[in-house]
Amino acid sequence: EIRSHRRSKSLRYQYRWGNYWYCMNTIKKNGLRINSTLFDFINKEAIPETNVDPEVFWLKFEEALSELSPLNKKLLDERENIQKKIDAWHIERSDKTINKKEYIKFLKDINYIVEEKDDFVIETSNVDSEISSIAGPQLVVPVDNARYALNAANARWGSFYDALYGTDIIPGKKDHRYDPIRGKKVISYVRNFLENVAPIKNGSWKKISKIIIKENNLIFFIDNNKYYLEDKRQFIGYNGEKEKPSSILIKNNNLHIDIIINEKSVIGKDDDANISDVIIESAVSTIVDNEDSVAAVDAEDKVKCYRNWLGLMKADLKTEVIKDGKKFIRKLNLDRGYIGLDGLKFELRGRALLLNRNVGHLM
């Protein structure tokens, strides 16, 4: 049962589910009936700073709906019709063995399978490197959870030490307090990793006592002797001073490794080369999901999703997090700055490339 009450330019709809009445305020605009929560979000939060007139937006939105909705319905009707034919075909033969040739012919007859076309070439331009040239992990995160979304966006860079220490890759029990023995196992694991991805010619990451930069090369000291990377091109940047860098940046397979040097840190002061952490580039892209991992049904649900996405796009999304009894604000990471071998400063992207996934034509 539905009841409606007119209030100026808005309609207040009430619908009953069981013994409960639910209210839905709507705005009438250009032939559309728009939920007031969504209407206010678009006008007051999404459109400002875009140089788009709200009146023009709603007018063009209505035009797009009027043009595309019939086409969308036609596609869905066609899909439903094909599905009914396939269902009927299988039901009729439920007690028979499927003849493959007969089945393929049937699928072609109903245009489920179409004839293969001539070979062709297609190219796209201006594709982000995270899609076109970098091979790396991709995450999927529900857009309605701000904390999860921020974590995923920030997952492009992370401490290799922390990741290993907190997982069962390193055997043994984990405690809330720092375990130096477990810490040494982590450091050994990372040194082996560096031996593989950025080997030192005739040397070892496990034996270095100092790292400096000279003539655009990394110099590793082992027993007062100098050693270099096997592939000197892997070293592309640093922070700090050449004689005392605070970090060195290495590139491998289009991904980056940031080796942090800090003699005053808990880890670095006990390390022969004062390496305190190794930050690796990992999840280069993230699917921000409006679909499988999210249940966004009504306007309030959807606006929550849209608001989080807007915050990600404007880079101002943040949320309060409580961890180990401590409160802090989680927000998007900044880009990472370095000094290049030419002496000029440059930046690497600090966040994952965000992709928005939705299936509006089905929802």
Residue ranges and their predicted role:
Residues 13-15:
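Hydrophobic alpha-helical signal/anchor motif
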Residues 1, 22-24:
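Initiator methionine at the very start of the polypeptide chain
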Residues 105, 111-363:
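Catalytic alpha/beta active-site cores
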